Amino acid sequence: MHRPQNRTAALLAAFGCALAYLPAGRALAAVCAALPLSAAGQSFALHCAAAPLAEELVFQGAVQGLLRPLGPRAAVCVQAALFAVQHGGAAGIAYALVLGVLLGTIRQRTGRVWPGWVLHTVNNLLVFAAG
């Protein structure tokens, strides 16, 4: 009887946490834009340093942790979906969904956020270098 309530509370808390990231992400971008760097340097600071850490802490850390009552697979999949929708158009969402599942699985298996943060940072470095 308590399990559905725990699941509902977990989903509501996770969605709330993900929604709270929207203005926080914008604030993070504003901070990076104020750095005394070139536009390319500011973009690098945001996409290859600040954003991967913030996203890992929020999505694979807090959101996935809040979703534990749903079970490990559901927690990974739901956090990955929430992570993905924050990444723009259809191609960005599809790519971020796969990345979110991978990062969430790493978090689930290791119990830590930092291995996913390293992978996320390397991913963003490669995307930044290619773009």
Task: Describe each PLM feature range.
Residues 14-29, 40-131:
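Transmembrane helix-loop-helix hairpins at the membrane interface
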